[in-house]
């Protein structure tokens, strides 16, 4: 593949946008290839300005569960865009969207915001306001957005950066413990008795690569939070509406007090939300005295796209069955390819999201993820992308499937992966 036009545009963009991107992971900093500048997406395929075609397994970092430019989502936007863009005032589609989200995700109430970061920020403020406590517990490798309170030992692109500009006075109230380690969470509560407002966790981590929480671990978190009067927050920005209509909660049968949403909930447009128990949600202004606001929150275009997406998922539950079958096939094909090539690897998969780790046989937390062969993953990402399979450039991100993918797309992924295995095995 040639990336001449992409390189030219990307280099020119750096004159006006720091690093040439509006989110660090897009810059391919850890790869030796230029990030393709994308011009079009349709179904499970994207195209760059050099004319290269890719089967997309990034899908706007999981947001495009129906594939790019799904006709129903596109039509929903067209239906409102000539009359409704933004008012900063109530609209009927907000009501319809809120009702649909509450019914499908099974939360009492919901507040829409503009991003996953805003959703988690709001959830934490709500937890502090409701409990009257200042400290929070998060887990190493879990990424909850770019606010100061969350960037302590975070995953995603943060894992590869040395950060400055973080307010230490804020961060000192963030306690970081090890994912899937019950002793570490018990120690945190013992050392910070009656000070912890909330525990926030990705029930399936997607930003240290895919790493699922153990069911008994989440059940223990629920019990510990109840014992100490702390809230349990599930960050389902990635997993919400991806693993099921009820997200990861349906898999674990553990109910948090609050849950955050993003990505899929906006149908590919900027949207986040926090939902949860009525008695807690009612603390938000103007009903309560925990403040949150946003000029563009719940705007008609985003609400329409999100409504069309969730409505389609609700009316077609077989989509989740189809995604599971495709993901099983992809996992199985990759395991066969890497095993036959005598590569040491681990594939972590939950539903339609997965990560390949090289050089290790098990990954259950961030420390284990960091011990994987990062240089091998770099080679893997470069090889796959330059051969038309668009995957994350970072080890600490997830691959995703959409309902637009087919079995032939999965087979093509395995074929290219087999080429990679032969490539790295060359003497």
Swiss-Prot record:
Its cofactor is pyridoxal 5'-phosphate. The keyword Transmembrane helix does not apply. Keywords: Cytoplasm, Isomerase, Porphyrin biosynthesis, Pyridoxal phosphate. One of its GO terms (cellular component) is cytoplasm. InterPro entries: 4pyrrol_synth_GluAld_NH2Trfase, Aminotrans_3, Aminotrans_3_PPA_site, PyrdxlP-dep_Trfase, PyrdxlP-dep_Trfase_major, PyrdxlP-dep_Trfase_small. The keyword rRNA-binding does not apply. One of its GO terms (molecular function) is pyridoxal phosphate binding. It comes from the Bacteria. Pathway: Porphyrin-containing compound metabolism; protoporphyrin-IX biosynthesis; 5-aminolevulinate from L-glutamyl-tRNA(Glu): step 2/2. HAMAP family: HemL_aminotrans_3 (MF_00375). Belongs to the class-III pyridoxal-phosphate-dependent aminotransferase family. HemL subfamily. Homodimer. This is Glutamate-1-semialdehyde 2,1-aminomutase. It comes from Caldicellulosiruptor saccharolyticus (strain ATCC 43494 / DSM 8903 / Tp8T 6331).
